[in-house]
Each structure stands twice: as C-alpha cells, then as structure tokens.
Regions:
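...captures the hydrophobic TM-helix bundle architecture rather than a specific catalytic motif
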Residues: 1-189
Length: 189
C-alpha cells in the first residue's frame, strides 16, 4: 500500500467515525425534542414563554463561526497560513462568544422569574435548560478540538496537502451549527 492510499484510508476511517458520532448525537437530540413535544401538552407547560434575546444573538455568532471555520479550511487548502491563522482565531472568538451569550440568555430567563430547578421552576424551562446545556457540552468538545487544530496549525502540521484535521473539525463544527439552528427553531416555534 502506498503512502497516498494509506492516507486516503485513514481519512475515510476518521470521517466514518465522526459520522457515526454525529448520527448518535442526532438520535439523542431527537429523543430530547420528542420528549419536549410530548411534554408541551401538560397543563403546567408555559404557553407564553419566549426565548431570551441573547439566544438570537448567539445564533448569529455560531452561524458566523461556521463561515469563518470554512474560510480557514479554504485558506489552508491554498497554503495560505496567515489567513488560516486569522480565520481559526476568529472562529474561536465566535465560538466562545456563543457560549457566553448562552449563559447571558440563561441569566435573562432567570431575571424574568423563570427558573430551571427548584420549587419555582417549570417543566418548560427545565427542558430548555437540558437541551441547551447538552448542546453546550457538545460545543465544548468542538471548542477543544478547535484549540487542538489551532495548536497543530501553529506547529505547522497542516498544509494544502495535509488538512484532514481541519476538515474533520469543520465537519463537526457545521454539524453543531446545524444542530443549534434546529434546536433554536424548535424551541422558538
């Protein structure tokens, strides 16, 4: 087996593993959203609950981060190390901004008198908390992988011919973005 064939097989294997992981995550969130739908018929469900403004802003942050991560991938494919560095760092800032905005959103929910646990909590806010925190946990994995990608990039491990790590990171990041958009729209409507 040649070196190129080995790299091709390795890339396919990593992509397949990531695909299986994303399918598993999709199934978990499908279960959570199904439980959400079933629970909406409860008499104690908050009918007038609205998502906090910070969740809207965070949605734009995560969508923008998907674009910048894609631009980083395109830059490395052209061997443009400087642009890759810039786009990776912008992606990191936007990813962290998303997390910060989510916590600001939690604060906005509590400020309106809606709690996630305890005697003053509701099933609505508890479900919202579970779904968004589960997404944040998966995003934490995305941020860790992004930090590893940034580290490897600054160690000059990526080039136009070797960009599998960035490609896998972009694939997972896009998945997280699409997942959040789905969850956001689901929670909004």
């Amino acid at each position: 087996m040649t070196k190129d064939e080995h790299q091709s097989r390795t890339a396919r294997s990593y992509k397949l593993i990531l695909l299986f992981a994303m399918v598993s995550m999709t199934m978990m969130f499908a279960g959570l959203t199904s439980a959400f739908v079933v629970s909406k018929s409860r008499v104690d469900w908050l009918k007038d609950f609205q998502l906090p403004p910070a969740f809207f802003i965070s949605t734009f942050a995560i969508l923008a981060s998907s674009i910048t991560f894609h631009l980083a991938k395109k830059a490395i494919q052209k061997d443009n190390q400087k642009a890759t560095s810039q786009w990776l760092l912008v992606t990191l800032v936007l990813g962290v901004a998303f997390v910060v905005l989510q916590f600001i959103g939690f604060g906005q929910i509590v400020a309106k008198g809606y709690y996630f646990t305890g005697p003053a909590s509701s099933i609505t806010t508890t479900f919202l908390y579970i779904v968004t925190v589960m997404h944040l946990l998966h995003l934490a994995g995305g941020l860790i992988s992004l930090l590893i990608i940034i580290y490897n990039h600054f160690k000059q491990k990526y080039s136009a011919t070797e960009s599998l790590g960035i490609g896998l990171g972009v694939m997972y990041w896009h998945f997280l973005d699409l997942l959040w958009v789905y969850l956001f729209l689901f929670l909004y409507f």
